[in-house]
């Protein structure tokens, strides 16, 4: 799901309810982001995708709301207004996201 404004970010998180949600931020001008985008597309759960060039305000809102440094590419697992897991650059791998999601889901 493309997240292109703060309203769609709020809706994506709200619709997840108590289920952890995956957010992926990327740059459409970065080679690392392109590789990681292909990797994240293998994740079996829905992913909220933010293209920073088109939605910088959303990226800024994520940094503010979750008190996390802005990076691209960056994957987050959130629940409500809490970050349960995050990774950036080459650490963003489909398997790592799936394993983190399983781990945080067990811990709830």
Residue ranges: model-predicted function:
Residues 9, 34-38, 84-92:
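A structural signal for the main folded, soluble domain(s) of proteins
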Residues 79-108:
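Non-catalytic, surface beta->alpha helical segment in thiol-disulfide oxidoreductase systems
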Residues 32-33, 59, 94:
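Short, well-ordered alpha-helical microsegments
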Residues 11-43:
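Local sequence-structure signature of Cys/Sec-based thiol-disulfide redox active-site neighborhoods
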Residues 1-17, 106-108:
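N-terminal leader/targeting and pre-domain segments
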Residues 25, 45-61:
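Thiol-based oxidoreductase modules, predominantly thioredoxin-like and allied folds used
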Residues 66-79:
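Structural micro-motif
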């Amino acid at each position: 799901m493309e997240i292109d404004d703060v309203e769609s970010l709020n809706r994506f998180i709200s619709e997840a309810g108590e289920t952890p949600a995956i957010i992926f931020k990327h740059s459409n001008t970065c080679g690392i982001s392109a590789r990681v985008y292909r990797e994240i597309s293998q994740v079996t759960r829905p992913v909220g995708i933010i293209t920073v060039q088109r939605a910088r305000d959303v990226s800024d809102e994520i940094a503010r709301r979750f008190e996390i440094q802005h990076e691209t590419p960056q994957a987050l697992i959130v629940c409500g207004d809490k970050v349960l897991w995050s990774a950036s650059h080459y650490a963003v791998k489909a398997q790592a996201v799936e394993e983190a999601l399983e781990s945080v889901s067990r811990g709830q």
